[in-house]
């Protein structure tokens, strides 16, 4: 019975405490100035709503008199608006008012903690404090000394009782573009006024954290299901985080997490807010998208780029196409694509290399085409070095419903990506704390970042509103990509990056050669994923799993390895080179100068392709060899790798012989019955023949000891095979 009474008493006390807290929080009002509803303002409201703050916005719809918005220099307009708003609260003794900027502010905790810390300050008004004095450094000597903490007043955030705040602003008679910070500073530095109003500064950042001058002090603190900003210098957890001065990008970074927008336990909690679903919408009703394609330098795998563009799961009749091709090298490819598929799009505009339009001007033209067309709902800018392998990419980006958003793209096996998580002091790359985790997928979400490039989606409405007067791709002497980001940031438009899906990757252009007929063949080192997609047979993985390997003769294995394109390009490359051997025993290309079993051929090293061919053997042939010949391991070394040409009137067949190899690879590069008749390979010891080689399939067999074989006569047409004597 006694225990029950104790429990009842405890419950009553807790209930009473909760009611007192609720009553206390009812006496808190947050005032802020926002002349327009920017993305920063919406972020501020979202963090306030998370903690159930009561918000009143002042000045919505007014013109802002000072350049740079309410967080910029000037600020007298904020004092005027506050003075007017406080008139109806001047006699409310118990009302606590928090006045903060909004575009660059987030809340990290709720009213209860805020009020507790305010009461502990034992002042009627508490201003945020800063490391740096602004705007008049001559006033530094007048500031009271502080043994520990920030010394100088910051006007971006302060809290106080309504009557005291009314007294604070009562003397304001300034202009809208006068400095609010200087006004408050002079009041604070007047000992009589400071004491009369009872003003103090939040020296140790218990309530307010101004980031300017304090970036090295502030880190994210991940608690269970909650995220705070921690000040390491004073070991405090501020309630209000303010990206004052040049630190707006840092509050963008912190705002990706605080207060609980991303945690290790929950992941992203806001990624599904405000989505624009495209499910159930017919093709004709889908938003119209202008796709801007930019080919600004020689780029590998352009054929794959266009194929992926065609395979986007979005109706071409709702897409318009703008292509800027700076490169004469790609002129025929672009024109061929448009000749075959241009009619599938709603409209097409091509600016070719003959126009000599600069990169930035072309990008401005693409954005303008959407900006000036009211029916253009989205502008999708894609550089040719983007491998967009997710067919739903465009839909996924549209559904995320952001003004500007980019999908994460990285280079194969590297941390290089199409975004920066932070900027250095001079506006160039700096690595944010979360950069590697985002790139490697350990943190997944939608991230507010300062720089994106290569591929992004912009709402047409943003181009016609916030970005309507902007020359987007020129800014000082910056490159077009950095100019674009600087201009977008300056207009207070957020740029988001999503890594919620695997959208694709970036090509490496560093070592791209343009001296061959088919330059993509040489990209096996720089861009292995795309090389595999273009050149390795789609059923190779089945062969590797043992599901598609045939044995036409004893210890002879037959499996798919090359695509049609790989076969065709290798043949065309050899014919383009054209220096076929004579097919006699004298051969200066090999050691000793004598060939016992001569063929009419071209060696891989003659076209400087031996490194790439060895890489192909190591990556794709060696794993199969080790599966098919258990216990044998190879590094796929070779002295001879070549393409052989058989013609009835040239060299139709090959005499019986052993190969100078441990094992041999023989890949058919064209098709029997279409390109030639006859041909094939006969293994004499087993009296077994392969008479109908399949294009793109490889025969693999032992070389110098057991598999004595001959090349059967080609009776019509021209037959090509790629041969490698492996581990001689």
From Swiss-Prot:
The keyword Signal applies. Glycans are attached at residues 177, 198, 539, 687. SUPFAM superfamilies: Nucleotide-diphospho-sugar transferases. It comes from the Eukaryota. Keywords: Dioxygenase, Endoplasmic reticulum, Glycoprotein, Iron, Membrane, Metal-binding, Oxidoreductase, Signal, Vitamin C. InterPro entries: Collagen_mod_GT25, IPNS-like_FE2OG_OXY, Nucleotide-diphossugar_trans, Oxoglu/Fe-dep_dioxygenase_dom, Pro_4_hyd_alph, Procol_lys_dOase. The active site is at 719. GO terms for cellular component: catalytic complex; collagen-containing extracellular matrix; endoplasmic reticulum; extracellular space; Golgi apparatus; rough endoplasmic reticulum membrane. One of its GO terms (biological process) is collagen fibril organization. It catalyses: L-lysyl-[collagen] + 2-oxoglutarate + O2 = (5R)-5-hydroxy-L-lysyl-[collagen] + succinate + CO2. Fe cation binds at residues 657, 659, 709. PROSITE patterns: FE2OG_OXY, LYS_HYDROXYLASE. It is found in: Rough endoplasmic reticulum membrane. It is a peripheral membrane protein. Part of a complex composed of PLOD1, P3H3 and P3H4 that catalyzes hydroxylation of lysine residues in collagen alpha chains and is required for normal assembly and cross-linkling of collagen fibrils. Forms hydroxylysine residues in -Xaa-Lys-Gly- sequences in collagens. These hydroxylysines serve as sites of attachment for carbohydrate units and are essential for the stability of the intermolecular collagen cross-links. Homodimer. Identified in a complex with P3H3 and P3H4. This is Procollagen-lysine,2-oxoglutarate 5-dioxygenase 1. It comes from Rattus norvegicus (Rat). The gene is Plod1.
């Amino acid at each position: 019975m006694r225990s029950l009474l104790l429990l009842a008493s405890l419950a009553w006390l807790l209930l009473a405490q909760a009611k007192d807290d609720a009553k206390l929080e009812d006496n808190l009002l947050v005032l802020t100035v926002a002349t327009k509803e920017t993305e920063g303002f919406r972020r501020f409201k979202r963090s306030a709503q998370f903690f159930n703050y009561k918000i009143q916005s002042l000045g919505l719809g007014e013109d802002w008199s000072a350049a740079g918005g309410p967080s910029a220099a000037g600020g007298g307009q904020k004092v005027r608006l506050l003075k007017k708003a406080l008139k109806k609260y001047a006699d409310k003794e118990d009302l606590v008012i928090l006045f903060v900027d909004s575009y660059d502010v987030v809340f990290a905790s709720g009213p209860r903690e805020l009020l507790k810390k305010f009461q502990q300050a034992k002042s009627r008004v508490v201003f945020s404090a800063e490391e740096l004095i602004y705007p008049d450094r001559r006033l530094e000597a007048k500031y009271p000394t502080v043994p520990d903490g920030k010394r100088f007043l910051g006007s971006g955030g302060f809290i106080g009782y309504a009557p005291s705040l009314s007294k604070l602003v009562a003397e304001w008679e300034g202009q809208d573009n006068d400095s609010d910070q200087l006004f408050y500073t002079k009041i604070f530095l007047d000992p009589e006024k400071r004491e009369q109003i009872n003003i103090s500064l939040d020296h140790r950042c218990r309530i307010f954290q101004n980031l300017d001058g304090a970036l090295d002090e502030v880190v994210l603190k991940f608690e269970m299901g909650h995220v705070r900003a921690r000040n390491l210098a004073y070991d405090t957890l501020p309630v209000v985080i303010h990206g004052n001065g040049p630190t707006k990008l840092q509050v963008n970074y912190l705002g990706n997490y605080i207060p609980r927008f991303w945690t290790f336990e929950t992941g992203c909690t806001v990624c599904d807010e405000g989505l624009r679903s495209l499910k159930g919408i017919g093709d004709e009703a889908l938003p119209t998208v202008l796709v801007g394609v930019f080919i600004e330098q020689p780029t590998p795998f352009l054929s794959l780029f266009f194929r992926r563009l065609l395979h986007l799961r979005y109706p071409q009749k709702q897409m318009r196409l703008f292509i800027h091709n700076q490169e004469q090298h790609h002129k025929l490819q672009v024109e061929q694509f448009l000749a075959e598929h241009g009619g599938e799009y709603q409209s097409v505009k091509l600016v070719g290399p003959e126009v000599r339009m600069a990169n930035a001007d072309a990008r401005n033209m693409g954005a303008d085409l959407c900006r000036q067309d009211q029916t253009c709902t989205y502008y999708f800018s894609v550089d040719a070095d983007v491998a967009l392998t997710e067919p739903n990419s465009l839909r996924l980006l549209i559904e995320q419903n952001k003004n500007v958003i980019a999908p994460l793209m990285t280079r194969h096996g590297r941390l290089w990506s199409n975004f920066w998580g932070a900027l250095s002091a001079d506006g160039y790359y700096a690595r944010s704390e979360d950069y590697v985790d985002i790139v490697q997928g350990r943190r997944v979400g939608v991230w507010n970042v300062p720089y994106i490039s290569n591929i992004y989606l912009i709402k047409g409405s943003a181009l016609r509103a916030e970005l309507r007067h902007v020359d987007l791709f020129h800014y000082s002497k910056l490159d077009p990509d950095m100019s674009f980001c600087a201009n977008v940031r300056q207009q207070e438009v957020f740029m988001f990056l999503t890594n919620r899906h695997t959208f694709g990757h970036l090509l490496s252009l560093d070592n791209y050669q343009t001296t061959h007929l088919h330059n993509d063949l040489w990209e096996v080192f720089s861009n292995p994923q795309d090389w595999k997609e273009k050149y390795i047979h789609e059923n190779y993985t089945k062969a590797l799993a043992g599901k598609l390997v045939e044995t036409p003769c004893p210890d002879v294995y037959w499996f798919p390895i090359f695509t049609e394109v790989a076969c065709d390009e290798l043949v065309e490359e050899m014919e383009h080179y054209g220096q076929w051997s004579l097919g006699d025993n004298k051969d200066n290309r090999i050691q000793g100068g004598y060939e016992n079993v001569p063929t009419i051929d071209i060696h891989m090293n003659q076209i400087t392709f031996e490194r790439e061919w060895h890489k192909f053997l190591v990556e794709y042939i060696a794993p199969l060899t080790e599966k098919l010949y258990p216990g044998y391991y190879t590094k796929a070394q070779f002295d001879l790798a070549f393409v052989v040409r058989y013609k009835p009137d040239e060299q139709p067949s090959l005499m019986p012989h052993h190969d100078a190899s441990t094992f041999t690879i023989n890949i058919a590069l064209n098709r029997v019955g279409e390109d030639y008749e006859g041909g094939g390979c006969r293994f004499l010891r087993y009296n077994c023949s392969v008479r109908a080689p399949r294009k793109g399939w490889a025969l693999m067999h032992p070389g110098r000891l057991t598999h004595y074989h001959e090349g059967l006569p080609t009776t019509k047409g021209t037959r090509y095979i790629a041969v490698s004597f492996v581990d001689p």
